[in-house]
C-alpha cells in the first residue's frame, strides 16, 4: 500500500489522498503530536473515517517504534538506577529525592508507565454499534489490519447464556448475569480465563460484535467478558458514546482514560450525549415501586419457608438494613408529595442543588451515599437470583432507577462540585401523568413484573427532573482523567465556534473541510412554493393548513418522475409525517406518488425498521423498477448514519425546519440557561441562536445521507421558504452554502426545469452505478417513445423546447418500461396465441379489432410467472366507429423460444407499438381526457389550464400536468392539451 509522509509521520493510504484528506490527516497527527484537542469537520463522502484511522494508527506505530528504541538504549541504565535506589533505600533522605526524580524521567522516556510502555490507546466512540461496525470494517481494509482492536458491547449484544439472553432489557440481563456469576452458575463465564489465550482469540486482531459472538460461541466462552480480557493488549477500543461519557459505565468497564486518545466520531450529537449522561429523572411511581420491592423482600426474609435459603441466594444485607432503607424511601415519598407544583405554570423549576435538599430530608446524603448504593446493588442482585429460582414476581425496576439516579447526583463531592451543580443544572418538578398499565404486560425496559405491580399514580405524584445544560460538564470529566487528546469529528459540526464554546474544553486544532465534489454533482434548490403557488412553510402555526399540506404533497409528486432511483423525504417530526400521510391518502396524492415510485415510511420499531430498509434497497436494485420514496424524520434512524449512496438516494427533500418543541420545559430552560451564562468574553451563543442551530444541525445531518463518495451525485431540495433567510442559510454546512450561491428561482416551474436538466447532464457525464440484473438487456435498442414528438405540436418554438425537455426526462425515468429492459427468454415458455393473422389493412382499420397487448407498465408481471409461465396480457375492447372499416381478423402474435433464433432475427419479430394519437378536435380531446382520469384529477386539470391562461407560466402548468398525466399510457394526451 502506498506510503505518504504527513507531518513527519509515514502514513499508509490505499490510494493517492485528495487534498482534503491530506489536510484532515495532518490535523489529526498535529493533535496527537502536541497532546492537544481538535474539532474537525469533513463532509460525508470525503473519506473521513479512512483518513482518521490511517493517520491515528500510523502515529501509534511511530510512537511504538520510538518507545522500543528508547527502551533498548535506556533499559540497562534503568536497572542500574533501580539497583542504586535499593542500596540507598534506608540511608536517610539526602540523595533519595534526586534519585526518584531521575528514575521518573527514565520511566517516562522509556515509556514504562501506562502498562504498555507508555504507548497510548485509541478509544474510538460513535453513536451506534452499526456505525462502529462500519469503522471496524474500514480498519480491516487498511494496511493496519494487523493492529489489535476490540469492541465493547452490552449483554444485549454479547450474552450467549440461553436463560439470560431470553430476558428483555439490558438491566434485567445485567443483574441476572451477576447473580449467576456470583452463584458460579454460568459455564460460559468460567471458560473465559482458559480460552483467552487460544489461537482463535489471539489470532483475530480485529474483533467486532459478530466476530466475538462467533468465536466465543465456538469456544463456549462468554463474549461479553472475553471482550474485557482483550482490552489490555488492544491498540484501539471501539465503544458507544455512553460507555465513555457515563461515569457508571466507565467504572463497570474498568476504562482507564489516562494517556488515551479519545476520538468522538459523529460528534454532532456529542453535546446532547454529554448532557443526557449527566441528567436523571425519577418519578413518584418509581419511589412507590422501590417501597413495594423492599416490602416484598422483607416478607420473603420473614417467611423462610416460602423461599428457602441456599448458597445461590446469599444475602449481603439484613432485615434491619431493609427496614432502614424503607424508612428512607417513605420519607422521600412524603417529601416529594409535599413539593408545591402549579401544573398550569408548566411545573416548578429550582436551582440544581435543590435535588440534594429533597434527598437529604430522607437522610440520603453525600456521607452515606456509598453505603446506600452498595445496599441497593445487593438487593437488586438478590432479587435477580430468587426471581430465577423461585418465580419471584418482582424485578427491582424502581430500585434500579433509584441506584442510577443516585450515581448521577453524587458523581462528585465537595463545595466545588456543588457550585458546578448550581451553575450547570436545574431541578424541574412536574406532575406525573397517569400511565395505563394492564395486567400481564411489561414495560419496554423489562423491569415491570408480569403481574399488575405498578401502583396507581396519586393525584399529588411528581416527576423530579435533574437536568444538565452544560455539555462541558461531561467533557471536563474526560480531561480530568488525563486523556492525551480529544478529537471531535463529523460531517456536520458547523458552525464550529458555538460548539467549541459550549464544550468548554481547550481546542487548539480546528478544520472545516470543503467537499470533494464539484458543481456538476450537486443541485441545491430552495423551493419556497408548490406548483399551485401555495407558500411552503412548515412552521407550527401553518402545519394544520390543508392548503400547505396539499401543496407539499403535490411538490413531492412533481419531483418524483424527474428524480431517478431513490428519493429521501425528511419531515421535522413524526406527528407531521403522520398528518401528511393521512391527508394525502384521503385526497389521492399518496396513490399518485405510489404509482410513480413505491413509498416506504420510517417505522419506530427496530425489527420493522430493518425489514423496511431491506425492502427499500431491494426495490431500488430492482432493474425493472423506477426507484422508491423513503419518508423519514429528521433526527430519526434514517437521518443518522445510514448510507444512501448512488441510486439509493439521488435526491433529498427537506420538508421543513426541525426545531425542538418550543413549549417543552427542557427547551425553555436550556434557552434560559444560555441567556444567563452568556457573556461577551465566553462567546456562548444565545438561547435563540441555539434553538435555530438545533434545527440546522438536524437538517445538515439529513442532507448528508446523499452524495456519499467522489463519483456520487444528487439533488438537495429545501422545501420551506424560511431557508431563504440569510441567518438560516449561514447555519448550513459550508459546502452546501457554496452551492446555494447560484440564483434561486421564486417560482416552481424553473426549479423543475433546472432539476430535470441537472439529472440529464449527470446521467450523460458522470459515472453511473450499475444495478445487479438477473438478465442482460437485449442491446442498444432505442426505448419506446412515451411522449409524442414535440415537432408535431402546433405551439411556439420555446414551448416545443420545454416540452422536449419534459419528454426526454419522461423517457429516462420510464426507461424500465422500454423494450431493452426485457428478454426473449421471458417469453420462451409462453403459449402461442391462437389468434389468426391480420390482413394487410392500414393501421387505423386495425383499431376496430379486438387486440391483446402486453402491459409493460405492470411491474407485478415482471419476470417469469411462478405459476403458469405465461406472459401477462390484458384484453381491450374497441368500439365501432363510422369512420372505420368493418372488423378485421385478429392479429397473430408470434412468440419464439430464444435459443432458436439469432439476435438480429429477434429484433425483427418484436414490433414497437405505434404511438396513440390524441383527437385534434378540442371537444373530443376533453371527452377522452375526462374518461381517462378520475374526476378529481379532471377538476385539477381544468384548474391548471385556467391558471395557464391567466399567468402564461409554462413551468407551473407543466408541473401540474405532470401530476395529472403521470402514467405512460396518458402521455400522448399532452399533445392535445398544449
Swiss-Prot record:
Gene Ontology MF, one: DNA helicase activity
Name this polypeptide is given: Regulator of telomere elongation helicase 1 homolog
Reactions listed under catalytic activity: ATP + H2O = ADP + phosphate + H(+)
Lineage top rank: taxon: Eukaryota
Enzyme class: isomerase
NCBIfam families named in the record: rad3
Annotated compartments: Nucleus
SUPFAM superfamilies: P-loop containing nucleoside triphosphate hydrolases (SSF52540)
Family stated for the protein in its record: Belongs to the helicase family. RAD3/XPD subfamily.
Organism name: Culex quinquefasciatus (Southern house mosquito)
SMART domains: DEXDc, DEXDc2, HELICc2
Record-listed ATP binding positions: 42-49
InterPro entries the record matches: ATP-dep_Helicase_C, DinG/Rad3-like, Helic_SF1/SF2_ATP-bd_DinG/Rad3, Helicase-like_DEXD_c2, Helicase_ATP-bd, P-loop_NTPase, RAD3-like_helicase_DEAD, Rad3/Chl1-like
Its job: A probable ATP-dependent DNA helicase implicated in DNA repair and the maintenance of genomic stability. Acts as an anti-recombinase to counteract toxic recombination and limit crossover during meiosis. Regulates meiotic recombination and crossover homeostasis by physically dissociating strand invasion events and thereby promotes noncrossover repair by meiotic synthesis dependent strand annealing (SDSA) as well as disassembly of D loop recombination intermediates.
Motif stretch (DEAH box): 265-268
A Pfam family that the UniProt record links to this protein: ARCH_RTEL1
